[in-house]
Amino acid sequence: MTYTMHYDSPLGKILLAADEEGMTGVWFEAQKYFAAKLPPEHEEGTMPVLGDACRWLDVYFSGREPDFTPKLHLIGSDFRQAVWALLLQIPYGQTTTYGALAKQLAEINGGKRVSAQAVGGAVGHNPVSIIVPCHRVVGSDGSLTCLLYTSPSPRDPKTS
């Protein structure tokens, strides 16, 4: 069973979702692909991992780096899972590009070429935004391209 709850952030309402295995979704309400992976059979409620996610978000939105990560249950293809794993390795306060992630992924896969556009598609479908930091990925020209930036005042990825 998937449980959901809402979190009021400085950037707007966020829907949190989790099942028995961990966090399955963190979406801003205006975000592209909002709740795309939320099963129809979900209910509003609470469970420990949702509380952990709220505490993580409280720390994050206070301007500090959280020293823990809520348990995650990322649901997606092997390719998307590999990209999301790389996102989790981007240090707080730093950014990288889609091209750099594509090169990293190619190295992991024995040199098999990966396009930056394919990486961008996986980043854009990240179901656990903020916690899995897709906002730390920028275009090759340094532009903000993350789908989280639907808010009128996005956070600076270089400081988060």
Where are these regions (language model features)?
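Compact structured core domains
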Residues: 20-69
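Intrinsically disordered, low-complexity, charged terminal extensions of DNA damage-control enzymes
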Residues: 1-3, 40-41
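Nucleic acid-binding interface residues in structured DNA/RNA-binding domains
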Residues: 3-10, 55, 64-151, 155-157
